[in-house]
Swiss-Prot record:
Subcellular location: Cell membrane
GO cellular component term of the entry, any: T cell receptor complex
Organism name: Homo sapiens
Subunit field text: Alpha-beta TR is a heterodimer composed of an alpha and beta chain; disulfide-linked. The alpha-beta TR is associated with the transmembrane signaling CD3 coreceptor proteins to form the TR-CD3 (TcR or TCR). The assembly of alpha-beta TR heterodimers with CD3 occurs in the endoplasmic reticulum where a single alpha-beta TR heterodimer associates with one CD3D-CD3E heterodimer, one CD3G-CD3E heterodimer and one CD247 homodimer forming a stable octameric structure. CD3D-CD3E and CD3G-CD3E heterodimers preferentially associate with TR alpha and TR beta chains, respectively.
Record protein name field: T cell receptor beta joining 2-3
Gene assigned in the entry: TRBJ2-3
Function: J region of the variable domain of T cell receptor (TR) beta chain that participates in the antigen recognition. Alpha-beta T cell receptors are antigen specific receptors which are essential to the immune response and are present on the cell surface of T lymphocytes. Recognize peptide-major histocompatibility (MH) (pMH) complexes that are displayed by antigen presenting cells (APC), a prerequisite for efficient T cell adaptive immunity against pathogens.
Transmembrane segments: none
Gene Ontology terms: biological process: adaptive immune response
Length: 16
């Protein structure tokens, strides 16, 4: 699955 993690405004990391 995919999971999008937000660390701050305009910052995100998508983990496959």
């Amino acid at each position: 699955s995919t999971d999008t993690q937000y660390f701050g405004p305009g910052t995100r990391l998508t983990v496959l």
